[in-house]
Amino acid sequence: MKVLVINPIMYTSETKNIKRAASIKDTMMYDFCLAFHEMGHSVTLVGGEPFKPTKSETYPFEVLWWECKCQKVCMPHCLPFMPETYWYVKKHRTEYDLIITSEVFSLNSLMAYRAAPDKTIIWHELAKHNAIMK
């Protein structure tokens, strides 16, 4: 199975100033994608560019980093807006069997669903991130 995982916020930043981590290999989404990979599936992980690690890393699956736009309104630490989501999913929807996107309130989840409603699952993490908007 070929899986696309769209998770712009790779780790929770408690402030608007996102401190870039050296690696994403300790994140939940990395482990999530690694599990799919270890089960023999082809995985592509999409993250927001502000969360791209400071050190160059190699991964056993493809990782794409997309630019977050309109950052004054759609702040990357709480409501990242990556317009590339819609166009990429629309263009490549036939290549993927499953599209998993994170957060029900995400603009990227909406775009993925609009481009491929029959393949998109929206996964919502009920953790610290929800309180950022308060």
Where are these regions (language model features)?
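A short, histidine- and acid-enriched strand-loop-helix "catalytic/donor-clamping" loop
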Residues: T12, K72-V73, L107, T120-K134
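Active-site proximal beta-strand in glycosyltransferases
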Residues: V3-L4, L98-I100, Y113-A131
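N-terminal subdomain of nucleotide-sugar transferases
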Residues: M1-K52, T94
